[in-house]
């Protein structure tokens, strides 16, 4: 099974991905659950991620950004995601193809058909379940310290947020919007409880995990 978490920077998706991975690891065993992230997931990708996050006052144009993240996705897909799925494990990814659509497509204005074509080229797998964590722009920006590479400004993140909402509306069979209202611990775990309940309702007795 392939599960992805999506949302704007600072929405809380990384925390929720980690919490779900721990829940499923406790349930099925750590060796049956793979947690990865984009950009990242492999030693090469983590080096590139570190370099990107260390940039200040440096902007990539939309196409350059798209091609860079697409190449990193291919590396992560063939080294982490696909092997995990073929082994019958539960793979949880903090970001996947929907992020490219929302960020480079809706956020940067890159042609959506081009984004879709490149996504299909490098990763011909569609997630079984996608949890989109929705938080206000104000809350998300207050949660995270964005560097020069990430900090596009509130208007950009508003476009990205609307992009994620459009993705959810267009893919109701796999995408589930989860509202996140605050940073309070009780709200974080309340969100986790909602995700677990939704996961159990979706999978029921259908989930098969490799021994």
From Swiss-Prot:
Biological-process GO terms, alphabetical: dTDP biosynthetic process; dTTP biosynthetic process; dUDP biosynthetic process
Reaction(s) catalysed by this chain's protein: dTMP + ATP = dTDP + ADP
EC number of this enzyme: 2.7.4.9
Top EC category: transferase
Annotated GO MF terms: ATP binding; dTMP kinase activity
Signal peptide span: none
Keyword list, A-Z: ATP-binding, Kinase, Nucleotide biosynthesis, Nucleotide-binding, Transferase
A GO cellular-component term linked to this record: cytosol
PROSITE patterns: THYMIDYLATE_KINASE (PS01331)
Positions annotated to bind ATP: 7-14
Highest taxon above the source species: Bacteria
Coiled coil: none
UniProt-listed InterPro entries: P-loop_NTPase (IPR027417), Thymidylate_kin-like_dom (IPR039430), Thymidylate_kin_CS (IPR018095), Thymidylate_kinase (IPR018094)
NCBIfam families reported in the protein's UniProt record: DTMP_kinase
Family label: Belongs to the thymidylate kinase family.
Listed PANTHER family: THYMIDYLATE KINASE, UMP-CMP KINASE 2, MITOCHONDRIAL
Function: Phosphorylation of dTMP to form dTDP in both de novo and salvage pathways of dTTP synthesis.
Name of the molecule in the record: Thymidylate kinase
Organism of derivation: Anaplasma marginale (strain Florida)
Gene from which the chain derives: tmk
């Amino acid at each position: 099974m392939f599960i992805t978490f999506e949302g704007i920077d600072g929405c809380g998706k990384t925390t929720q991905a980690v919490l779900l991975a721990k829940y499923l690891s406790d349930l099925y065993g750590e060796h049956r659950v793979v947690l990865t992230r984009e950009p990242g997931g492999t030693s090469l990708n983590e080096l590139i991620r570190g370099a990107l996050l260390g940039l200040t006052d440096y902007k990539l144009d939309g196409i350059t950004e798209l091609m860079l993240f697409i190449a990193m996705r291919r590396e992560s897909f063939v080294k982490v995601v696909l092997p995990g799925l073929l082994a019958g494990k539960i793979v949880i990814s903090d970001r996947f193809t929907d992020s490219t659509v929302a960020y480079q497509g809706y956020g940067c204005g890159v042609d959506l058909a081009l984004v879709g074509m490149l996504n299909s080229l490098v990763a011909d797998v569609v997630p079984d379940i996608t949890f989109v964590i929705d938080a206000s722009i104000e809350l998300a920006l207050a949660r995270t310290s964005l560097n020069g590479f990430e900090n596009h400004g509130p208007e950009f993140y508003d476009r990205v947020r609307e992009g994620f909402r459009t993705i959810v509306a267009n893919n109701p069979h796999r995408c589930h919007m989860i509202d996140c209202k605050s940073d309070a611990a009780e709200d974080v775990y309340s969100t986790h409880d909602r995700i677990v309940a939704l996961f159990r309702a979706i999978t029921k007795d259908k989930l098969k995990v490799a021994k």
